[in-house]
Amino acid sequence: MRGVRGVRAGALLVGLALAAAACGGGNDNGTGTGSGGNGNGGGSGSAGGGGSTETKKVGVVYDIGGRGDQSFNDSAAAGLEAAKKELGSKLEVKELEPNADGSNRKELMDSLADDGYGLIIGVGFLFSEDIAKSAKESTDTTFAVVDGFDTLCTQPNSNLICLGFKEQEGSFLVGAAAALKTKTNTVGFVGGLEGDLIKKFQAGYEAGVKYEAGQKGKKIKVLVDYAGNTPEAFRNPAKGKELALKQIGQGADVIYHASGGTGAGVIAACASKSKYAIGVDSDQSLTASPAERKWILTSMLKRVDNAVHQTIKSYVDGTAKGGVQTFGLKEGGIDYAQNQYNKQLLGDIPTTLDQLKQQIAGGEIKVPDKPQA
């Protein structure tokens, strides 16, 4: 069974192929790059890729901003690069990015399915509903969505995988770091789109601040602001800078952002006022300018790269399974950043954070995933 889309598209394939040859190439309906071999690599009816030696075709559709966002998309891209390095000629890869308003996400995924890409990864929760529809239409294709809604991935033997993270656990760690670093006993949190996902970051951060403040016998205030209620809230550095400057004016000397590209403004604001920023998703010290880098205390590492890498690898070796897959501290999906740039800033803070990691992974500390009253 080729699936609804495969049947619908099948009658057109010969004509389209001839037309594409005459025109000198196809149309991605978005920004795209391709690499790798030239096999078919279609999956079977379940999530597994079959484990054969043929080249497997893997498509990745980034969210708006694509590669170069120094955050979420770049972390996914790093996972793809790791998979390409490990699997080499076993992979043929194509990368796409939606248009400015994201309205063609499903169109891009469907085009990859029609072109025989056996695994298609959508980067970000905004893909969730579209990718669920595509999975129902293209039953021979395996789909995976980073931060996908769990309610869409209830069938463990389906062709849809939701890759989830315990963001609250890593946010707890950087919250503890903020509590240990603050001199004003006021810290800040700047979120992107206000919703359940980013509330997990807020919840963990507030819990970490509160826990470590309690250990030190202090009371620390957490200021909270969100950049908006639309996807634009993840790509508005000017708004991020405005909110961070407001919090600094209210006494915050450490600010954690969970706001994608908007966070560039948060980091810039902190650096301009000699206050500390905490990055998110990837190690933002590694991509920041030298002037800003020295004010990035750490970053909450959401190992999207590991999740993407593992998903591609399991697809290629035929062990991928549909359903929800969750990555926390215990699974290597969450951490905090330590590097040559922030070693001096952190001082002995890692000693405390590493102890907390063990306590969280072992279940001794339960981190809330919703803000507490």
Residue locations for each model-derived region?
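A residue-level marker of the well-folded mature domains of exported/periplasmic proteins
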Residues: G34-A373
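Bacterial signal peptide processing site
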Residues: G24-N27
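Bacterial N-terminal signal peptides that target proteins for export
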Residues: M1-A11
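C-terminal motif of bacterial Sec signal peptides marking the signal peptidase cleavage site
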Residues: A19-A22
